[in-house]
């Protein structure tokens, strides 16, 4: 699963949230029930489920018949307990005989006439109806959005399948499935497995029959139905389905252009062919996540559809989410975590294979840069540091999503570094084949790798997976000219407490002198260690952990001359990026600015050019400004780099000559994203005519409303209360949802005494649109009005919020109380 709004590192200019909000967004949990960190004990095995669903669109109700085949797992099984929430059970048979049953708030309990023996099989048929609050969602036209295509879709992870099917709803069991979906004749449906047929019914509806012949965990069952447009293709004889809401079909080709290449890459590198009967990718409206890896049938948010007009401006498009969800078809679906505490076995692998796709398709530098950026982001999320990846003390599998995703991906990166490519991919092949169709825990992964490579990994898994944190190094060196020797002192400075200890890690040290370079492997395992290396002269450059092989922070003070040499000459992207960032701490040094200017113009990799521009924006001064202007106007530069350059211009608030230059970029640049960045920077520098420029830009039409949204965002940053009426108007129901998001966040910053703004934001809390519900919470928190505390508390008490939304609401209440000093 991809969490909502995760984006790769070239997209800073497209995000309409502050760094604080972004860190919270990246921690946003799935909309599931409270997770059980230990796998359940079971007294039966669910072997097959056949579900027929009918839908009442007007009432947003479902009617279902579930035929579930089970086998007892022990003797004397007197009753069967199915997970079921909010469903009215209308009738039930066991082996064809009507049977009494009882229900609780969370379960359907079925007593057996005679206690079952181990291996004894029974067939349970359940007739039911309900109006699901979770799990299954109706997206329908209403008075605000009358053109909205009709859609129904499900989201089972973590434990929400129980809201539309009475079923065993925990990942440590697998079942084959069949879904029969009776829908309007013009609709398309997607579900797991093979389409067995479509039958016309007497009432004018059609029933689609989907059959999943290989077992899956029930949270991976999927139903999608609605007014969709489908493009069909095939890969090695396997049907491919590309499905989008009607009206979005012009985005199909630009959004799915790499699917076949991804299938080739993953199948061949893992030496495990894609394992399912089809691969469908369906984009749906108002999805509660970025993407979900339902077996053979991924569901994705329409937010990730790639507008063909903007495709050339976006480095990877929707590749990151599509590669993530496709990787899950092996890691998460073919082999599935047994319990939620081991969810990193799903998400860490999918995150890693996002990077692997980028490495193979866009180049190793791209992948290295993304890992470097995510490392810094992970360390900024302080709450993650003291918690291990496998954490059985949490009842929410994604409370610490940054560990499951980001750190999980980094662990696999480090494992590949340690094992080498041949052993790493051999081990993954062995892991998948040995555990094919099984539910696993971390010990199964470790065992498979050890058996495939004859490598003991106890220490690796102990410190990186079962314990918390990562090493934080303080490094220094001295050069002894007489002895021709370098002494390197390494201290681990992380606070050793709880599950955070000292780390034992291999480190590559590279030393460059005028006569050449040489690398030395060392092992750091103590609180303080020193190492000596021969050197025929004072070093031009000393690299600690060349290439960023280890998840860590490093404080390593070096002279400007050394850092400039590293920026120009280090072989790897992370080492050059580290040098650029370190140079940002040096003020009033013309040589530093000149070196960063050279990097911004001439470095071979776009990410280093971007980092140099960011650092120049931080340093400031006329020379830095001229360098940034040069990058912004360089028509041969990549649009996402020019976007970053234009963002930096917003930091030069004292230069009145910038206003017309930014206005020209906003009006004339060939890239929409660069024009959008210019509008935001016009607001940041508070240009004399900024208000009029931004109001005029709100009226502009552009693909996906890129310019309007940037102008709305800019009006919030400008801080001119004249914009309140305009922004409130654009936040109203009926406006484009992305524009509403921008308007809500923007107006939250204006006229703090205006209670009408707070009332408007509060009124959006109960709208039936996830995109609105999510962002208005942050707008309310940013506004800081204590009048919102009671409505937020009422929302919590209502029970109408998911576990993920609950954590966000609680964050905003705490933020508001902190500002008022209340408890």
Place the predicted regions along the sequence by residue:
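Bacterial N-terminal signal peptides
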Residues: 17-27
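Non-catalytic accessory/interaction domains
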Residues: 246, 327, 422, 435-618, ...
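Structural detector for internal amphipathic alpha-helices that build alpha-solenoid repeat scaffolds
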Residues: 548-552, 574-588, 598, 607-621, ...
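Amphipathic alpha-helical scaffolding segments comprising HEAT/armadillo-like alpha-solenoid repeats
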Residues: 556-567, 589-601, 621-634, 653-667, ...
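Short inter-helical turns and helix N-cap capping residues of alpha-solenoid HEAT/ARM repeat scaffolds
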Residues: 571-572, 604-605, 636-638, 670-671, ...
